[in-house]
């Protein structure tokens, strides 16, 4: 049986020896068409096609070879091609060796040479595309060349050449590879022939051999050849070897008739049908319309929707939103300088100059950055003509002021640049031109929508930061995307790199939300520790090591419940702990010296010596001459004599640097028994009140018991508090020091019992009673130590007050004392100020305190006050100074604005949630560990350099604290409570009085309380010249960097948008083996969908940006000449179409249906899912909708006429620039039904412009398959630059792709279909490469406006078109 099989195999004729393939293909397997001296293959089999490419009789046709390797992937796999090549190669070798003396040997050698040329072309030009990404193909090829046995010199040279070419490509495409030739000791020809080349380890599969466990990284060249469309298109052109124009394929007469018939039959789904184009129809109407109805828009997505014009394997993008109005989801990403149209320029080819408005904010006249001190003419009334502009600026400014500045990376200059470059406001000077009075207040609503979208993210981030301290987390997110390739070219389509900005902010918001949710959902069942000493240690954040120089210090507990410290203040410095290297402290020794096992009887009538340490700050300045009252939550009942103190450097904001110095003496008058007694009692009472309320919110199960404890304690101390408030009041500055006071008193049983809490939760606990008795017994022992140090304490107290009384605080944060926060949850600002105004007015009755020169700094601006959500408590920036509370008598008591600013609406559990999360890592059952050994570990050790950097404030014009300001304003200025009217009015310029919803309600309340808010102030006339300077001041107040253009260094490719597109072009199946897994791109992929979901939550809520406010709208294009706009649009189209890869065109890789994008921001966040064609289509559609939106939203008929004329002139300039893509966008928009219905407006158009329009609108005619636009494209002058109209090419490709691929399934290939595709693609790529001849300067302001455009949704356009007059 086996013999029969062998005979049968011998009788089988090799594939390439069959008559129809040897020596050349016959007509039965390959049909050609000779046209103009070139050979076009119409149909063929795959073996016949390979035979034709390596024909021994015909000359080498490099054009055919190039076309084949461009399109073969559409009808066969690379593995199958390599199989055919190997089979033909081996067949030629066998043929040569079969009869060395015959003619067949010569033929076989020619075939081998032609096959070598074919393989060399493949390896040289498509190694990165085919072999780098396909491990199995590489192994198959290596098996082919390694399996060759030396025969003769001719064949050896072919194999050696292929091996050398392979090794050369491998060395170029992978990094971290040693010199393979040297490593394998390859020197001679024999070495090359014997060398079995190994594949490069990928790391993603189980490789064998040494060193194969670690995958190699691809080189920059490899990545560029894989995912950079610009480089790939240039490489394609380099293979053509022609200086001629590549023509579009010519169709026969029969084919043209068939295509014309198809065009008429498929009108409803064609890319172009301008006669019936209407972008104004709503989405619902389009869904219900018929396929051939006039609803068909000029948008490319209409053809994409047709399944006939799309590939079966095309992906469908997820809808951006399930809401019909996508425009409510997000808008443009650009931050314009203002939403203003600054100048009206006459139409460029205009026949008449109608009016020109002088710009108030041009690059050449940018005002210098000022602090607004020269603003004399202020506007704070309800000026309706400017409410839109000023209100929007105020709202956005407030967002940035609320944003914490501890992490400057989170507020990059690009955000300010977006507002600077994109916000378009009309000019405020009318001059002699007859314009409507309301024109001066108009702005581009579409541009403002773009800014509002980004500001939405900023406000969300600010709100989260106000609830959670996430400095380290957000810093990591900011650094996540800082690695940019500065060597690449400047990116035009995202010139402000807003994709990175938005991604960074969104990542921060996502991370903060996760952290906040984890902490909020975290439940705790800890019991309060019976050890009040442990609780006290927690409260002071390991203050004991600061007392290392005094071994006799001690502390006593006067209250069983002390509050949790607040660490959730995102804008305030945290208390610094300077750890003792010995991890020991005198306080610890004093406590450990007395064993708690020595329980004595509780002596309720014993004498007590109570000591207290308080941290002085801006909130602790309400005190009495005889009884010092501390209102600062940061006080802790620790007896201190002297300690290293923190010195604040003047004019350096928020801990730019600090040092330590010896403590100074203080006034002994502050150490009187009366002072000590009142201070201890009142401070402890207030501290207990605030903190216990916080614990109530955090632990709901214990609310009733703790509430009873607090109530009992408050009742016992109410008389003392009242007495303190009635004493003679004093005024003393914040000293930035620690102050110690003691109270020697003899407490009666009744008085002591009145102070003790009566909570069954605590007093009913046996362990608590035992330990409290132990503390009572130890009190007597510790009292002796206290007496021995009293003299030293008195001396140090004197030094404190004398030397530190004039130190100025340099912080500007507006915060609240937490005890005020919880004193009355229902208190209103009016109620508080009634009590405090009387206190303030008493200042004039007392001698003024000498004001140090260093303290004379401007008063804080009310508009810079942070929002309610960022109000701090104990650990605010103001509380960083450790200040003495001891002060001289006969000083007037003063109440700061911060204390008025006391209403905090966020829940108290937000304030304490961070401590709750960090509770008790050892999982004991107590809220605070009773272990006394933990005293040194109550606070983690801090890195001072990190803290210093963390709290540095970028602002250069910060004001001093209100304590210092009040000292500086003790003269006649105190008549207005220390408020500078001029400064206040300057800030009020940015407040929109008529739109209270855009204002911070706390700022509004403060202004009313201070008497500086007046709605009845006189209105400013619209034509007043002061209005111009007013708007300029608003721009300055927004703290925008005044740069006329981006620096030269910024012209590098900053766009993360481009980089992410490059990385996502690689096939997902091989990306992990090609890209470094630690790269920022890989880490960000996990959050891309979350970012999109976050942006989708944005809804348009500002009434000033809705279509109801159309009377305020004016297109920004009216502030620029049409030539400039055409130039910038050309730059944008050049880079957009450069993202279209030749392979995407050949495969027609585009989505069957695209969402309706209404802003460039939507495209930025979705770009990774879009092919180059999809990106170009989406941009085309967005631009058409934007043009229609600008015209429809313009209500004034003259302005609408000017807008239409301006677009006509821009289109004419685009035609001159050979920018046919933008030209067609404008023509299709102007020819839409929505725009054409404004008949009265068209009647006002200049006759010359109407003639120009008649010529332009004939360009997209369907006659003879778009013969007009094709003629324009064919007549292009290459050296002048060109932007081809991509829709023509997509139309041709769509029609061609409908042809059958196989005439006989899997046997006879319709190769003409693919040759036609290649010809179309090469024509497009060549014309796109001519765009490099453009020599256009970048105008960053105008470019930003043109890039980050926003359009109305179709429903909005439809709604306006029905309401607008004809």
From Swiss-Prot:
The keyword Cytoplasm applies. This is Guanine nucleotide exchange factor LTE1. Residues 290-314, 661-690, 955-979 are annotated as: Disordered. Residues 37-170 form the N-terminal Ras-GEF domain. Residues 671-690 have a biased composition (Polar residues). GO terms for molecular function: guanyl-nucleotide exchange factor activity. InterPro entries: Ras-like_GEF (IPR008937), Ras-like_Gua-exchang_fac_N (IPR000651), Ras_G-nucl-exch_fac_CS (IPR019804), Ras_GEF_dom_sf (IPR023578), RASGEF_cat_dom (IPR001895), RASGEF_cat_dom_sf (IPR036964). It holds the Pfam family RasGEF. Its main location: cytoplasm. PROSITE patterns: RASGEF, RASGEF_CAT, RASGEF_NTER. Residues 298-314, 661-670 have a biased composition (Basic and acidic residues). It is found in: Cytoplasm; Bud. The keyword Cell division applies. Belongs to the LTE1 family. Disulfide bonds: none annotated. Keywords: Cell cycle, Cell division, Cytoplasm, Guanine-nucleotide releasing factor, Mitosis. GO terms for cellular component: cellular bud; cytoplasm; plasma membrane.
């Amino acid at each position: 049986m086996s013999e029969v099989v062998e005979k049968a195999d011998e009788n089988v004729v090799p594939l390439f020896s069959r008559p129809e393939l040897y020596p050349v293909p016959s007509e039965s397997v390959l049909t050609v068409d000779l046209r103009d001296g070139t050979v076009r293959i119409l149909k063929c089999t795959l073996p016949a096609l390979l035979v034709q490419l390596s024909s021994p009789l015909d000359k080498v046709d490099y054009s055919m070879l190039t076309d084949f390797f461009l399109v073969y992937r559409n009808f066969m796999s690379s593995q199958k091609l390599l199989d055919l090549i190997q089979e033909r190669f081996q067949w030629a070798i066998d043929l040569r060796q079969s009869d060395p003396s015959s003619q067949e040997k010569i033929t076989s050698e020619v075939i081998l040479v032609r096959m070598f040329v074919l393989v060399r072309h493949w390896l040289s030009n498509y190694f990165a595309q085919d072999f780098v990404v396909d491990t199995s193909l590489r192994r198959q090829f290596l098996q082919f060349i390694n399996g060759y046995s030396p025969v003769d010199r001719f064949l050896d040279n072919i194999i050696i050449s292929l091996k050398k070419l392979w090794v050369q490509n491998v060395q170029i495409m992978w990094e971290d590879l040693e010199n393979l030739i040297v490593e394998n000791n390859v020197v001679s020809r024999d070495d090359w022939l014997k060398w079995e080349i190994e594949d490069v380890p990928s790391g993603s599969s189980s490789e064998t051999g040494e060193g194969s466990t670690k995958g190699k990284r691809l080189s920059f060249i490899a990545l560029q050849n894989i995912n950079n469309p610009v480089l790939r298109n240039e490489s394609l052109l380099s293979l053509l070897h022609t200086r001629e124009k590549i023509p579009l394929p010519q169709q026969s007469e029969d084919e043209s008739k068939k295509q014309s018939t198809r065009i008429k039959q498929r009108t409803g789904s064609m890319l172009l049908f301008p006669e019936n184009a209407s972008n104004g129809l709503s989405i619902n109407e389009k869904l219900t319309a018929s396929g051939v109805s006039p609803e068909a828009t000029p948008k490319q997505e209409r053809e994409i929707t047709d399944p006939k014009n799309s590939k079966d394997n095309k992906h469908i993008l997820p809808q951006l939103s399930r809401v019909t109005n996508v425009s409510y989801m997000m808008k443009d990403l650009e931050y314009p300088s203002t939403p203003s149209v600054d100048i009206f320029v006459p139409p460029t080819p205009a026949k008449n100059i109608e009016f020109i408005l002088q710009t108030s904010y041009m690059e050449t006249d940018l005002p210098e950055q000022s602090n607004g001190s020269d603003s004399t003419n202020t506007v704070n009334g309800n000026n309706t003509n400017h409410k839109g502009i000023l209100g929007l600026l105020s709202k956005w400014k407030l967002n940035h002021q609320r944003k914490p500045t501890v992490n400057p990376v989170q507020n990059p200059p690009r955000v300010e640049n977006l507002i600077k470059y994109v916000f378009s406001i009309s000019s405020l000077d009318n001059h002699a031109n007859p314009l409507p009075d309301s024109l001066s207040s108009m702005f581009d609503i579409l541009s403002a929508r773009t800014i509002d979208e980004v500001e939405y993210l900023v406000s969300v981030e600010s709100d989260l930061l106000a609830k959670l301290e996430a400095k380290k987390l957000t810093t990591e997110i900011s650094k996540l995307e800082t690695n940019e390739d500065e060597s690449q070219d400047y990116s035009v389509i995202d010139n402000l790199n807003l994709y990175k900005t938005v991604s960074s902010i969104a990542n921060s918001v996502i991370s903060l939300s996760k952290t906040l949710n984890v902490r909020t959902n975290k439940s705790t069942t800890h019991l309060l520790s019976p050890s009040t000493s442990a609780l006290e240690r927690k409260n002071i954040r390991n203050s004991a090591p600061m007392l290392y120089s005094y071994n006799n210090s001690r502390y006593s507990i006067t209250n069983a419940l002390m509050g949790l410290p607040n660490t959730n203040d995102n804008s305030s410095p945290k208390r610094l702990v300077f750890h003792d290297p010995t991890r020991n402290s005198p306080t610890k020794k004093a406590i450990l010296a007395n064993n708690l096992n020595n329980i004595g009887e509780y002596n309720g009538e014993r004498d007590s010596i109570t000591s207290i340490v308080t941290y002085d700050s801006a909130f602790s300045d309400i005190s009495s001459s005889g009884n010092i009252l501390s209102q600062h939550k940061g006080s802790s009942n620790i007896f201190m004599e002297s300690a290293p103190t923190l010195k604040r450097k003047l004019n350096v904001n928020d801990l730019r640097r600090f040092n330590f110095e010896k403590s100074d003496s203080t006034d002994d008058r502050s150490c009187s028994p009366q002072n000590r007694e009142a201070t201890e009692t009142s401070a402890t009472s207030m501290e207990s009140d605030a903190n216990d309320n916080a614990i109530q919110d955090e632990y709901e199960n214990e609310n009733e018991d703790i509430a009873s404890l607090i109530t009992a304690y408050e009742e016992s101390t109410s008389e003392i508090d009242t007495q303190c408030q009635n004493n003679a009041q004093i005024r003393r500055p914040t000293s930035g020091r620690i102050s110690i006071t003691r109270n020697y008193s003899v407490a009666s049983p009744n008085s002591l019992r009145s102070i003790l809490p009566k909570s069954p939760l605590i007093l009913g606990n046996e362990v608590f009673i035992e330990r409290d008795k132990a503390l009572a017994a130890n009190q007597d022992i510790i009292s002796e130590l206290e007496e021995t140090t009293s003299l030293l304490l008195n001396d140090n107290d004197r030094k404190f007050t004398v030397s530190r009384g004039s130190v100025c605080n340099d912080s500007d944060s507006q915060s609240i004392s937490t005890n005020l926060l919880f004193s009355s949850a229902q208190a209103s600002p009016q109620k508080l100020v009634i009590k405090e105004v009387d206190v303030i007015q008493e200042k004039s009755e007392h001698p003024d305190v000498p004001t140090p020169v260093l303290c004379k700094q401007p008063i804080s601006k009310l508009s810079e006050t942070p929002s309610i959500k960022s109000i701090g408590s104990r650990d605010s920036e103001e509380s960083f100074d450790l200040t003495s509370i001891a002060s001289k008598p006969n000083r007037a008591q003063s109440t700061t604005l911060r204390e008025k600013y006391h209403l905090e609406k966020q829940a108290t559990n937000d304030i304490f949630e961070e401590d709750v999360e960090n509770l008790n890592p050892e999982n004991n059952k107590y809220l605070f560990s009773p272990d006394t050994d933990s005293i040194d570990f109550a606070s983690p050790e801090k890195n001072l350099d990190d803290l210093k950097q963390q709290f540095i404030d970028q602002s250069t014009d910060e004001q001093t604290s209100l304590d210092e300001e009040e000292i500086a304003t003790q003269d006649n200025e105190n008549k207005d409570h220390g408020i500078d009217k001029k400064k206040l009015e300057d800030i009020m310029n940015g407040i929109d009085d008529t739109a209270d919803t855009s204002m911070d309600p706390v700022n509004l309340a403060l202004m009313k309380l201070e008497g500086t808010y007046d709605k009845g102030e006189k209105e400013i006339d619209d034509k007043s010249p002061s209005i111009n300077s007013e708007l300029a001041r608003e721009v300055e107040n927004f703290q925008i960097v005044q740069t006329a253009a981006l620096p030269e260094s910024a012209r590098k490719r900053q766009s993360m948008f481009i980089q992410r597109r490059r990385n996502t072009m690689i096939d997902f199946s091989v990306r992990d083996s090609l890209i470094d897994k630690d790269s920022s791109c890989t880490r960000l992929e996990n959050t891309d969908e979350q970012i999109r979901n976050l942006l989708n939550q944005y809804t348009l809520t500002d009434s000033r940006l809705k279509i109801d406010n159309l009377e305020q709208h004016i297109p920004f294009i009216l502030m620029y000449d049409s030539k400039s706009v055409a130039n910038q649009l050309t730059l944008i189209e050049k880079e957009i179409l450069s993202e279209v890869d030749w392979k995407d065109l050949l495969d027609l890789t585009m989505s069957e249906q695209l969402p309706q994008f209404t802003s460039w921001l939507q495209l930025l966040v979705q770009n990774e899912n879009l092919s180059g064609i999809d990106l170009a289509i989406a941009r085309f559609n967005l631009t058409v909708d934007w043009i229609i939106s600008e015209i429809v939203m313009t209500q004034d008929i003259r302005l609408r006429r000017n807008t239409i004329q301006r677009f006509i002139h821009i289109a004419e300039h685009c035609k001159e620039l050979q920018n046919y893509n933008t030209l067609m966008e404008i023509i299709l928009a102007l020819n839409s039904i929505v725009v054409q219905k404004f008949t009265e407006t068209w009647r006002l158009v200049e006759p010359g412009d109407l003639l120009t329009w008649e010529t332009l609108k004939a360009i997209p005619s369907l006659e003879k398959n778009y013969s007009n636009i094709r003629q324009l494209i064919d007549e292009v002058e290459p050296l002048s630059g060109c932007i081809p109209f991509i829709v023509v090419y997509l139309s041709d490709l769509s029609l061609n792709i409908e042809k059958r691929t196989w005439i006989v399934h899997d046997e006879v290939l319709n190769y003409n279909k693919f040759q036609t595709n290649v010809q179309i693609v090469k024509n497009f790529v060549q014309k796109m490469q001519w765009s490099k001849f453009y020599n256009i300067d970048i105008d960053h302001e105008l470019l930003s406006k043109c890039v980050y455009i926003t359009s109305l949704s179709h429903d909005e356009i439809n709604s306006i078109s029905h309401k607008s007059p004809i």
